């Protein structure tokens, strides 16, 4: 029971760090992609946020 609630906050914090770290080097790449396909940029961001969730 104690492990369950502990994993919940851990996953949230990990997700925040993962997105922040990936967001830093992504702006440069996203900028080029945004010019080509702005819709793809939105999908990429969504996939990144969903990736850490199921990965856990």
From Swiss-Prot:
Annotated spans, Disordered: 21-40
Ranges of compositional bias, category Basic residues: 21-38
Protein name per its UniProtKB record: Uncharacterized protein YLL066W-B
Organism this protein belongs to: Saccharomyces cerevisiae (strain ATCC 204508 / S288c)
């Amino acid at each position: 029971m104690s492990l369950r609630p502990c994993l919940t906050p851990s996953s949230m914090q990990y997700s925040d760090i993962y997105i922040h770290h990936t967001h830093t080097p992504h702006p440069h790449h996203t900028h080029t992609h945004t010019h080509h396909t702005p819709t793809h940029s939105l999908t990429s961001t969504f996939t990144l946020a969903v990736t850490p969730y199921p990965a856990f």
